[in-house]
Regions:
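Hydrophobic two-helix hairpin corresponding to the core of helix-turn-helix DNA-binding domains
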Residues: 9, 21-22, 58-61
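Residue cluster at the C-terminal edge of the helix-turn-helix DNA-binding motif
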Residues: 15, 24, 37-46, 72, ...
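Short alpha-helical elements of helix-turn-helix
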Residues: 1-15, 29, 33, 62, ...
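A short LG(V/I)-centered, amphipathic sequence patch enriched
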Residues: 40-57, 62
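N-terminal winged-helix
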Residues: 29-30, 34, 73, 77-80, ...
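Conserved short C-terminal alpha-helix that flanks the catalytic cleft of nucleotide-sugar-dependent
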Residues: 65, 82
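Short helix-boundary/capping micro-motifs
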Residues: 12-28, 52
Length: 107
């Protein structure tokens, strides 16, 4: 299961429309369909009922949705934290103190 699969799944599940999900993610609609199909094949179950142009979540799709959201949220939180650590300034701090002060306060 790839993060892209979950991203596309959540987008379609929230919009109940493959074309709108593709538009929101700035990808072609066939790419969305292909990735959803790959996810369904991997899981061995349909996540969406497709009736004409209407799309609804199956029971399995409804069960997966909160987990997919949680996974994507956790990944974004991890990325944010790592980016923040990359922007922290690093270096050496030198302190100067008279010998009487440093003997008491500095190791």
């Amino acid at each position: 299961m790839e993060l892209r699969h979950l991203t596309y799944f959540v987008a379609v599940a929230e919009r109940l429309n493959f074309s709108r999900a593709a538009e929101a993610l700035h990808v072609a609609q066939p790419a969305i369909s292909q990735q959803i199909r790959a996810l369904e094949q991997e899981l061995g179950i349909s996540l969406f009922d497709r009736i004409s142009k209407r799309v609804t979540l199956t029971e399995a799709g409804r069960a997966l949705l909160p987990h997919a959201r949680q996974i994507l949220s956790a990944v974004e939180a991890a990325r944010s934290e790592i980016r923040e650590r990359g922007t922290l300034k690093r270096g050496t701090v030198s302190l100067g103190a008279p010998p009487t002060v440093s003997a008491h306060f500095l190791p």
